[in-house]
């Protein structure tokens, strides 16, 4: 078993080291992660300059390769020639903060998993809800359990799984739930400030609160102490509207 690890918080993030510890007993691990934090990078690729790859030589990250690019860059170059042996599984995370609802469209963590999926490799993204690493040991343990369950009882068809773990002690986690994506309200307004020259600058506002957190959603599961397991797909076609748009077709 060869597992490729990536993330969006950067190669020094505690969540990546925890994921490495969790999965190392399961097989050979290759880590290719961003040099810097790329939260919110989505599926962006670096096309205007070459990418450089470095290798950490000390600490918990010893042997990790890191790239001066995005999470998608990391998985893309790993799967298209940088590493010799094709991985059996791509795992991204453990992210600092949730990736639920529309978050998956912005998340670099989920994007790294999507890139693996696009290249035909089963892929799983892990996120721990809430900022901080208060119960990272619990998330580490759950990540290993989820991957072990995937290996022993894989779902039918291609796998792209988004996992959100509540920020709780392991003993307080209520269990696992298969979920759909919930929905958020619109993001908060931008925060306007001025730089020292009096020129306006803007910070992107906070994500909106949950709009659809009904039973069966990722929001609902996590709010009730469950691990949320959401299988994703990439076909964004609105099939319900397709018939209406066909009226616009030319002869």
Swiss-Prot record:
The keyword Transmembrane does not apply. It is found in: Cytoplasm. Nucleotidase that shows phosphatase activity on nucleoside 5'-monophosphates. PANTHER family: 5'-NUCLEOTIDASE SURE, 5'_3'-NUCLEOTIDASE SURE. GO terms for cellular component: cytoplasm. The keyword Nucleotide-binding applies. Its main location: cytoplasm. It comes from the Bacteria. It catalyses: a ribonucleoside 5'-phosphate + H2O = a ribonucleoside + phosphate. Disulfide bonds: none annotated. This is 5'-nucleotidase SurE. GO terms for molecular function: 3'-nucleotidase activity; 5'-nucleotidase activity; exopolyphosphatase activity; metal ion binding; nucleotide binding. It is an enzyme of class 3 (hydrolase). HAMAP family: SurE (MF_00060). Its cofactor is a divalent metal cation. Its EC number is 3.1.3.5. Belongs to the SurE nucleotidase family. Binds 1 divalent metal cation per subunit. The gene is surE. Keywords: Cytoplasm, Hydrolase, Metal-binding, Nucleotide-binding. It holds the Pfam family SurE. A divalent metal cation binds at residues 8-9, 39, 95. It comes from Ralstonia nicotianae (strain ATCC BAA-1114 / GMI1000).
């Amino acid at each position: 078993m060869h597992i490729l690890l990536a993330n969006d918080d950067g190669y020094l993030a505690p969540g990546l080291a925890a994921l490495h510890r969790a999965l190392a007993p399961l097989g050979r691990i290759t880590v290719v992660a961003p040099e810097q934090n790329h939260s919110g990078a989505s599926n962006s690729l670096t096309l205007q300059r070459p990418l450089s790859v470095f290798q950490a030589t000390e600490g918990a990250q010893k042997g990790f390769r890191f790239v001066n690019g995005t999470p998608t860059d990391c998985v893309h170059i790993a799967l298209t020639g940088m590493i010799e042996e094709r991985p059996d599984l791509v795992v991204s995370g453990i992210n600092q903060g949730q990736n639920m609802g529309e978050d998956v469209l912005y998340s670099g963590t989920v994007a790294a998993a999507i890139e693996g999926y696009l290249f035909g490799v089963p892929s799983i993204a892990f996120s721990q809800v809430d900022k901080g690493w208060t119960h990272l040991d619990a998330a580490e343990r759950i990540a290993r359990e989820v991957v072990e369950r995937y290996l022993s009882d894989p779902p039918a068809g291609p796998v792209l799984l988004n996992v959100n773990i509540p920020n709780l002690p392991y003993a307080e986690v209520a269990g696992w739930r298969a979920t759909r994506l919930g929905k958020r309200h619109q993001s908060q307004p931008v925060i306007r400030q001025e730089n020292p020259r009096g020129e306006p600058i803007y910070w992107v506002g906070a994500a909106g609160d949950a709009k659809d957190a009904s039973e069966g959603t990722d929001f609902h599961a996590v709010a009730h102490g469950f691990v949320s397991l959401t299988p994703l797909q990439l076909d964004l076609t609105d099939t319900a509207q397709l018939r209406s748009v066909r009226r616009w077709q030319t002869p």
